[in-house]
Amino acid sequence: MASESFLNAHPDMKFRTEGFLAYQDGRFAEARKYFLQAAEFSDKPAQAMLAEMAWKGVGQPPDRPMGYVWADVAAERGYRQFVVLRERYWSELDAAERDRAIEEGSAYMQRYGDASAQYRLAKHLQRARRLMIGGRPRKDVDVWVPGPYGLRTQIRGHDFYATKFWEPKQYFAWVDAVWKDPPVERVEVGPLEGVEAGRERP
């Protein structure tokens, strides 16, 4: 199985990768389109990018409440870097912006939250797994996808057929292992900014 086929079977990683490539090239409207597609398949990094783009007005008019809405969806699983982003955005919203974020947030969580989006991805993985049976592994081809803190995550060709990439529960666990509190030795970052605790949440 070639790297393109592997990514086609994993639309969360595929569209996240396409989104980052477009973003790096300055094609922000195109990047946003790809991140939205990845977000449909429960991709939390893509949802965090949509939060940043809305908040800063990258490829769209600035929209701080929607920046928070996307950050809230991205932080759903408790990934530390996305929780920090959500907390920072909430602390900077004024009362009217918070009201709007609360008003619009439930619809986005319903569509892009794990209850819907992981189900969507699980169905896709199951279909793709049936199609890939009988294929020939390509051990010489690796896949690189955007990972935590701007680094890339490598998936080696000899792992393409590993169960963890095809069985939904195992795949979700693998994604969590990559993104939830990444080991210090895998990243080079500065200290995280502290966030004041005890703020009221919707």
Residue positions per predicted region:
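Extracytoplasmic and endomembrane cell-envelope/extracellular-matrix remodeling and assembly machinery
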Residues: 2-3, 93-202
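Short coil/turn linking the two alpha-helices of tandem helical-hairpin repeats
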Residues: 20, 51-61, 90-94
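Short helix-capping/linker turns of helical repeat alpha-solenoids
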Residues: 8-12, 22-28, 40-47, 56-58, ...
